[in-house]
C-alpha cells in the first residue's frame, strides 16, 4: 500500500510537478530556488501555486492544464485599478473541481488495484465552507458527489441542491423532531438520505416520524472507536468524542430496530477519527477497528451497505510532509489505499460483500482554493547606524555596553558570541531599571537601545544557521530584530484558527520572490488586541516565529497572500472590533490565458456590522446629526461632517486609501 505521491522516487504526476516547479524557478536564478525552498511552495502549493520568472506568485487552478495560469500579483493590481478593495478573498472554483476529481481518481485506482467491488462516494460536509460558490462548483463538476449536513440550516441547503446531485445525503449532528422530519421528507422525495444515529434518544423520534410520513427510514449509526488520532483536532474522535454510540449502545440500537421490525433500515456504518489526521498509521488503525464493527454488525443480521469513514484526510499546510499538526505524512493514493485495503481485507476474511465506501473529505477539497490578499499599511523596521561613544562621565552601564561593542570588533578576541549577547542584555536591563528610577535620561535610554540593536546585528552576522548550537540564538535575535508589518486585515475574522488553535497557514509576499529572503518580519493585524498577530511561519523544513522576507521598499511594501484559507476560516470568522467579511471574487483561468473575475461577496459595510449588534445605522445618523446641529460650527462644516459620517456608515470596515 505504498503511496506513489510520497517521498520516494518522483514517479507520480504530483512529485514530477514539484520537481518541474523547482527547475523552472532555478532557471531564472539561484536566489529564486533558495526562496522556493524557504517558503516550501513546491510542496504545500500542490501544483496550484508556484513562482514565475518575474518572482511573482502564479496560480494554476487545474494542474492537468498547465497552460491555464495567472500571475496573482498582476491580477490583484489590475483589480485594484478597477476599484477592488483590500483585503479580499481571491477564490479559484476550478481548484475545488480538481480536488474532487483527484480524490475520486485516487479511490478509483485503489479499488482497481485491490479488486474492490463496492462503489466510492465523496460526501462533502458543507460545514467546512457553506458558501454558494463552493457548493455549486462541486455539484456542477460532473463528478459523483454526496452532501453532508450537521444542522437544520445545513440540511435545508443540502436538500435544495440535492436535485442537482441525485446522490447521497448524510445527516449528522444533534437532531430534533424538525431536523428528522426534514430528512425523512428528503427520503420521501426520492433522495437517498441517511439519518445517522449519534444519540440513543434520536431513534424513537425517527421511528415515530417515519410512521407518520409513511416512509421507510434509511439509517446509519456512528460508532465511537477506541482509536484516536493526534494533534489539534484529536478530541473529535476516540472514546471521549462528543458524538457517537459506545459498543453497548450500538447493540441496544440493533435490538431496538429489530423489535420495531426496522433492522433493514440500518444500512450505514459511520465513524470519525478526527480532522486533519497527520499520520497515516492512525488512519489505518482506525479503519481496521471500524471494519470489525462492520463484520460484527453483519453477524447480528444487520445488512450494512455503506461504510462512512468520516473526515480526517489532511492537507500539508507546512509543506514538510511530516507528522506535525499542520502537515501530513501521506498523499491521496496512500490514503485511499489504506482505506480500501483495510475494508477489503476484512470483507474477504469473513466472506462479506464489499460495501460502498464514503469519505467526508471537506478540508482536503476546499483548503487550497482561497487566498486572502491584503496590503501592508505600516512597517516598523530596525535601522542600524554607526554608534557613537558615550560621554566620558556617562553611567557605568552605558560604558559597559560601549566596551562590549568595542571588544566585538577587536581581532583575536576569545569571548563567545553568546557571552557578548548576555553581557549586553544584562547591561540594557540595568539601564531600563535605572530609567524607571530616574537614573538615566530618555536620551541615554535611546542611545543604549540603539547600540544594543547594533550589537545584535553584529552577532547575527557571525552566526551560522548550520551550527545547531547557534540555532537558539538565531531564533532569539530574529524575533527581537524582525520588522513589524501592520497588515490591513483581522486575524479573528479571516484566519480564526491561527488565533484559536495556533494553526499555521502559508503566508508570503506576492512578488519579489526572485530575491533572497534576507529580512525577517512579524505580521500584526489592525484589531485593538495583542492576540492579533501571527506567531508561526514556514521556514524551509521547519517552523519559525518570524517570516522570511525578501528586501523591500518600506514606503511601498509588497502585498501579502495568506494561502489555504478555504476550509473553515470564512465560516468561523468572528466580528472582533466589528471588522466584517472581506470582499470576495471568483477567478476562472482558461488555457488561452484569458481570466474571468466575478464579484461573489461585496464584503460587509460598517452599517452591516452595527446592525449585527442591534445598532440601527439610521438612528445613529440621527443622533449624530442632532449633536452636530447643537454645535456653533458653520453650516458648510456641519454638512461636511454629516456627509463624512454617512459615507463611513456605508463604507468598508477595513482601512481604505484616500
From Swiss-Prot:
Reactions mediated catalytically: L-arginine + H(+) = agmatine + CO2
GO molecular function terms listed in the Swiss-Prot or TrEMBL record: arginine decarboxylase activity; metal ion binding
Coiled-coil stretches: none
Named cofactor requirement(s): Mg(2+); pyridoxal 5'-phosphate
PROSITE patterns: ODR_DC_2_1, ODR_DC_2_2
InterPro entries, A to Z: Ala_racemase/Decarboxylase_C (IPR009006), Arg_decarb_HB (IPR040634), Arg_decarbox_C (IPR041128), Arg_decrbxlase (IPR002985), De-COase2_CS (IPR022657), De-COase2_N (IPR022644), De-COase2_pyr-phos_BS (IPR022653), Orn/DAP/Arg_de-COase (IPR000183)
Annotated binding of substrate, by residue: 307-317
Positions of modified residues (N6-(pyridoxal phosphate)lysine): 127
Biological process terms in GO annotation: arginine catabolic process; putrescine biosynthetic process from arginine; spermidine biosynthetic process
SUPFAM superfamilies according to UniProt: Alanine racemase C-terminal domain-like (SSF50621), PLP-binding barrel (SSF51419)
Cleaved signal peptide residues: none
Enzyme Commission numbers on file: 4.1.1.19
UniProt keyword terms in alphabetical order: Decarboxylase, Lyase, Magnesium, Metal-binding, Polyamine biosynthesis, Putrescine biosynthesis, Pyridoxal phosphate, Spermidine biosynthesis
Top-level enzyme category: lyase
Pathway: Amine and polyamine biosynthesis; agmatine biosynthesis; agmatine from L-arginine: step 1/1
CDD domains named among the record's database cross-references: PLPDE_III_ADC
NCBIfam families xrefs: PRK05354.1, speA
Similarity comment: family membership: Belongs to the Orn/Lys/Arg decarboxylase class-II family. SpeA subfamily.
Primary role: Catalyzes the biosynthesis of agmatine from arginine.
Name used for this protein in its record: Biosynthetic arginine decarboxylase
Species assigned in the record: Salmonella typhimurium (strain LT2 / SGSC1412 / ATCC 700720)
Amino acid at each position: 500500500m505504498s503511496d506513489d505521491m510520497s517521498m520516494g522516487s518522483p514517479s507520480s504526476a504530483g512529485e514530477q510537478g514539484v520537481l518541474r516547479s523547482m527547475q523552472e524557478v532555478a532557471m531564472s536564478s539561484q536566489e529564486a530556488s533558495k526562496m522556493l525552498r524557504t517558503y516550501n511552495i513546491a510542496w504545500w502549493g500542490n501544483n496550484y501555486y508556484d513562482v514565475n520568472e518575474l518572482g511573482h506568485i502564479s496560480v494554476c487552478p487545474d494542474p492537468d492544464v498547465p497552460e491555464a495560469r495567472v500571475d496573482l500579483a498582476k491580477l490583484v493590481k489590475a483589480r485594484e485599478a478597477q476599484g477592488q478593495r483590500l483585503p479580499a478573498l481571491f477564490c479559484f472554483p476550478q481548484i475545488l473541481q480538481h480536488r474532487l476529481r483527484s480524490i475520486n481518481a485516487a479511490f478509483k485506482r485503489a479499488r482497481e488495484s485491490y479488486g474492490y467491488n463496492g462503489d466510492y462516494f465523496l460526501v462533502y460536509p458543507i460545514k467546512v465552507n457553506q458558501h454558494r460558490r463552493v457548493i455549486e462548483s462541486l455539484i456542477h463538476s460532473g463528478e459523483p458527489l454526496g452532501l453532508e449536513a450537521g444542522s437544520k440550516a445545513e440540511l435545508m441547503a443540502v436538500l435544495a441542491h440535492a436535485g442537482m446531485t441525485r446522490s447521497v445525503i448524510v445527516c449528522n449532528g444533534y437532531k430534533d423532531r424538525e431536523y428528522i422530519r426534514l430528512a425523512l421528507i428528503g427520503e420521501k422525495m426520492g433522495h437517498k438520505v441517511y439519518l445517522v444515529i449519534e444519540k440513543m434518544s434520536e431513534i424513537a423520534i425517527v421511528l415515530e416520524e417515519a410512521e407518520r410520513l409513511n416512509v421507510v427510514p434509511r439509517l446509519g449509526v456512528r460508532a465511537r472507536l477506541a482509536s484516536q488520532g493526534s494533534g489539534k483536532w484529536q478530541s473529535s474522535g476516540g472514546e471521549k468524542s462528543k458524538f457517537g454510540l459506545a459498543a453497548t449502545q450500538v447493540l441496544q440500537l440493533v435490538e431496538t430496530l429489530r423489535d420495531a421490525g426496522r433492522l433493514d433500515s440500518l444500512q450505514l456504518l459511520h465513524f470519525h477519527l478526527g480532522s486533519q489526521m497527520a499520520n497515516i498509521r492512525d488512519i489505518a488503525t482506525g479503519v481496521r477497528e471500524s471494519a470489525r464493527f462492520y463484520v460484527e454488525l453483519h453477524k447480528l443480521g444487520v445488512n450494512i451497505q455503506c461504510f462512512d469513514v468520516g473526515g480526517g484526510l489532511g492537507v500539508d499546510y507546512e509543506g514538510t510532509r511530516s507528522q506535525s499538526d499542520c502537515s501530513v505524512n501521506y498523499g491521496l493514493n496512500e490514503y485511499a489505499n489504506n482505506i480500501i485495503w483495510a475494508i477489503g481485507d476484512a470483507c474477504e476474511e469473513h466472506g462479506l460483500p464489499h460495501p460502498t465506501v464514503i469519505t467526508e473529505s471537506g478540508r482536503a477539497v476546499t483548503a487550497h482554493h482561497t487566498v486572502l490578499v491584503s496590503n501592508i499599511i505600516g512597517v516598523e523596521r530596525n535601522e542600524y547606524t554607526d554608534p557613537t561613544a558615550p560621554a566620558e562621565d556617562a553611567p557605568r552601564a552605558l560604558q559597559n555596553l560601549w566596551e562590549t561593542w568595542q571588544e566585538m570588533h577587536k581581532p583575536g578576541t576569545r569571548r563567545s558570541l553568546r557571552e557578548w549577547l548576555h553581557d549586553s542584555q544584562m547591561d540594557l536591563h540595568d539601564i531600563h531599571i535605572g530609567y524607571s528610577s530616574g537614573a538615566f535620561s530618555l536620551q541615554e535610554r535611546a542611545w543604549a537601545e540603539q547600540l544594543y540593536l547594533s550589537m545584535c546585528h553584529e552577532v547575527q552576522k557571525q552566526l551560522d544557521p548550520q551550527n545547531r548550537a547557534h540555532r537558539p540564538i538565531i531564533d532569539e535575535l530574529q524575533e527581537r530584530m524582525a520588522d513589524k508589518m501592520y497588515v490591513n486585515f483581522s486575524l479573528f475574522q479571516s484566519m480564526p484558527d491561527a488565533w484559536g488553535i495556533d494553526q499555521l497557514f502559508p503566508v508570503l509576499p506576492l512578488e519579489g520572490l526572485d530575491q533572497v529572503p534576507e529580512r525577517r518580519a512579524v505580521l500584526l493585524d489592525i484589531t485593538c488586541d495583542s492576540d492579533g498577530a501571527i506567531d508561526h511561519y514556514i521556514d524551509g523544513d521547519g517552523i519559525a516565529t518570524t517570516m522570511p522576507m525578501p528586501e523591500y521598499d518600506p514606503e511601498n511594501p509588497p502585498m501579502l497572500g495568506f494561502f489555504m484559507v478555504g476550509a473553515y476560516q470564512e465560516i468561523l470568522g468572528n466580528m472582533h472590533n466589528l471588522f466584517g467579511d472581506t470582499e470576495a471574487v471568483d477567478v476562472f483561468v482558461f488555457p488561452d490565458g484569458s481570466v474571468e473575475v466575478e464579484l461573489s461577496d461585496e464584503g460587509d459595510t460598517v452599517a452591516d456590522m452595527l446592525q449585527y449588534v442591534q445598532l440601527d445605522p439610521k438612528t445613529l445618523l440621527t443622533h449624530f446629526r442632532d449633536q452636530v446641529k447643537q454645535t456653533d460650527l458653520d453650516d458648510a462644516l456641519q454638512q461636511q461632517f454629516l456627509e463624512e459620517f454617512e459615507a463611513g456608515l456605508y463604507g468598508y470596515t477595513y482601512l481604505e486609501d484616500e
